UniProtKB/Swiss-Prot annotation:
Its EC number is 3.5.1.5. This is Urease subunit gamma. It is an enzyme of class 3 (hydrolase). Keywords: Cytoplasm, Hydrolase.
């Protein structure tokens, strides 16, 4: 299977998000990479589902709460930026203070 660097990045992100999702389901608090991966994957999947940039900016802030991440992680993530593919092209989605 031949993958472009962008496709490899998306696959790695998805894998990290899947791990984070499983840990969250077990009641574990997520660390920085897990939190960013889970938020980013939610944005990418939302774009794939046909949601708008505005909807995804809102959705990104609903993925995790402060109670679901380790102490200090929320402050380490002032924003998450993801280049997502929409039907009309690639757009940058920015979520400010995603862990609320």
């Amino acid at each position: 299977m031949e993958l472009t660097p962008r496709e490899k990045d998306k696959l790695l992100l998805f894998t990290a998000a899947l791990l984070a999702e499983r840990r969250k389901a077990r009641g574990l608090k997520l660390n920085y990479p897990e939190a960013v991966a889970l938020i980013s994957a939610a944005i990418l999947e939302g774009a794939r589902d046909g949601r708008s940039v505005a909807e995804l900016m809102s959705l990104g802030g609903e993925v995790l709460t402060r109670d679901e991440v380790m102490d200090g992680v929320a402050e380490m993530i002032p924003e998450v930026q993801v280049e997502a593919t929409f039907p009309d092209g690639v757009k940058l989605v920015t979520v400010h203070e995603p862990v609320r």
